[in-house]
Curated annotation (Swiss-Prot):
Keywords: Cell membrane, Cobalamin biosynthesis, Cobalt, Cobalt transport, Ion transport, Membrane, Transmembrane, Transmembrane helix, Transport. The chain crosses the membrane at residues 6-26, 41-61, 79-99, 107-127, 136-156, 172-192. It is a multi-pass membrane protein. The keyword Transport applies. GO terms for biological process: cobalamin biosynthetic process. One of its GO terms (cellular component) is ATP-binding cassette (ABC) transporter complex. This is Putative cobalt transport protein CbiM 1. Part of the energy-coupling factor (ECF) transporter complex CbiMNOQ involved in cobalt import. Forms an energy-coupling factor (ECF) transporter complex composed of an ATP-binding protein (A component, CbiO), a transmembrane protein (T component, CbiQ) and 2 possible substrate-capture proteins (S components, CbiM and CbiN) of unknown stoichimetry. It comes from Methanocorpusculum labreanum (strain ATCC 43576 / DSM 4855 / Z).
């Protein structure tokens, strides 16, 4: 969800920016540390950033009159975690606002909090939880992470709208109304995004399994299995 300039009251713009700031600061530190330890992660990080950029540009009109789009953050959150993804997401949002007119600058903190912070955080928790069971392959785990990232992003967006514009004084009523509007198109979009993200993750695991192993995304046994299939 890209909030345009002037959509949210300035007080709420500041509030959401302050909430997003710690995640972004930590993410910048995390990226610096990661690159200093192994610069080979840079190409994959760039791919994840490009994936977010392209996917999140797809605007799909809703029958309710709003617009919905994928977020693309589930893949990056699965590979690099929520902190790194928050920075990638912020960079993408700045470029989209500056070059393409998607979203505004005064509302950047609010958009970043929903799309670049909370969505990736939820995706990472789901991905890690599924992978720790030892029963869920990479592709399906990323699928679930991407679906959750998308849905949580729009739930937070609905909350942001509800807090700024309660219906007859009721935040809950406004939240449910906004969530219902988004859900019509957003749920199918999240499933499609999940499928694409899962396929991309599986492909990357086949061509660059050693990078994903270094990131702790796949195990040594999974790498051996991939290499044996290619032999």
């Amino acid at each position: 969800m890209h909030f345009m300039d002037g959509f949210l009251p300035i007080g709420w713009c500041v509030f959401w920016a302050v909430l997003a700031a710690p995640f972004l600061i930590y993410g910048m530190w995390k990226i610096t540390k990661m690159i200093n330890n192994d610069r080979h992660v840079l190409p994959l990080m760039a791919v994840c950033g490009a994936f977010i950029f392209v996917v999140s540009l797809v605007d799909i009109p809703s029958p309710t009159g709003s617009c919905s789009h994928p977020t693309g953050t589930g893949l990056s959150a699965s590979f690099f975690g929520p902190a790194v993804t928050s920075v990638l997401g912020l960079i993408i949002l700045v470029f989209q606002a500056l070059l393409l007119g998607h979203g505004g600058f005064t509302t950047l903190g609010a958009t970043a909090f929903s799309m670049a912070v909370m969505g990736p955080l939820a995706a990472w928790l789901v991905f890690k939880g599924l992978r720790k069971t030892g029963r869920v392959p990479l592709g399906p785990a990323v699928f679930c992470a991407a679906v959750v990232a998308n849905c949580v992003t729009y739930l937070i967006t609905s909350l942001q709208i509800a807090l700024a514009y309660p219906v007859e004084g009721s935040v809950l009523t406004a939240f449910l109304a906004a969530a219902a509007v988004f859900a019509v198109v957003q749920i199918p979009i999240s499933i499609i995004e999940g499928i694409i993200s899962g396929l991309v993750a599986t492909y990357i695991a086949r061509i660059k399994p050693e990078i994903l192993q270094k990131l702790g995304v796949i195990s040594g046994e999974e790498v051996k299995k991939v290499l044996s299939e290619q032999a």
